[in-house]
Amino acid sequence: MEFGNLYLTSKLKTIADADLKSNMLNHAYLLFGQDEIYLNYLAKQFAKHVLCKNNICGVCPTCKKIEKGVHADVLCYPKTDDKNIVVEDVNEIVEKAYVYPMEESKKIFILNNFDLATVQAQNKLLKTLEEPPKTSMFVLTSTNPSNILNTIKSRTKQVSVPLLEDKQIETFILNNSTLKLREVAPFVASSQGNLTKAKKIVDDPDFVKIKQLCLQIVLELNKSGDILKYSSKILSFKGRVTEVFDELSLVLLDCLYCKLNLLERVSNNQNINEFLSSNFSVKSLKLVYEELLNSQDKLKNNCNVNVVVDNFLITMLEVKHKWK
């Protein structure tokens, strides 16, 4: 994947610059946020930042080896994307941590998705983080830091990684897909600053269908007979109702912003005229949006999907007509 200069403008680079300048580089960092792809990318760039002697040049042997994943002193775990870190991995990490680096002054261990590591594996790593070798450094990433032992977190420098700007997401999508600039706006809006989500929806053949369905629901749900029609269409995306509701929330917000004349906040401006002419009132849109949030909570709590979808559409229609 092509990431451009995302690291150079990141919060992590600012922190790393300060730590390196003051010679206060920590032995362990925990990078946490919502975006798995971005976190894993940052961890690798951070390793380049620490080891490259030419300010993250990207072309020296150190940078090239780290990028290809073949640097002897930059070791990534888990070794494959379909695995989580287990005790056997940590045994190997601990053993290698006490071996002097082969090419650099420091050995860096990147532990991606550490919140998915087993409790046994986390406990096994704890002693090494408590008494770290002077020549080893650890970079952990996590999208759910609450699943990491507090004793582990307390021995790391924690860096909260924010989501990206829409322009950065747009550039990422254009660099990593066949989409044209005129086509990219709906994908950027639905990515919500998240590279992981951006990649998923760009690669998803059903994304455009889901987006179109959500537009139809907001603009064309007008009579009771439409409830069964749209309920069936939503449920046809088996196991993906939560994603449909996520998209629906974005469409509802866009419609609301149009009605409030806050056009600068509309994420996808291709449907502004339809939203402005829709028979939704501001009050009804706010109530429907609140009901959608409640429905999303019900899905998270494993309520019956069919019932949640039907009840939401019924409420949406009732509110739409009551508060014209």
What does each model-found stretch correspond to?
Residues 1-49, 62-65, 134-135, 144-251, ...:
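Charged, glycine-rich active-site and insertion segments that engage polyanionic ligands
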Residues 1-120:
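Clamp-loader machinery-focused feature within the broader ASCE/P-loop NTPase space
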Residues 31, 111, 125-126, 142:
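Hydrophobic residues in beta-strands of the RecA-like P-loop NTPase core, especially within AAA+ ATPase
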Residues 76, 140, 158-160:
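Structural signal for conserved beta-strand scaffold positions within catalytic alpha/beta enzyme cores
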Residues 95, 127, 150, 154:
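Conserved adenine-binding aromatic site and its adjacent loop/helix in ATP-hydrolyzing domains
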Residues 98, 123-140:
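Conserved catalytic/switch belt of AAA+ P-loop NTPases
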Residues 112-118, 126, 130, 146:
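Catalytic acidic motif of RecA-like/P-loop NTPases
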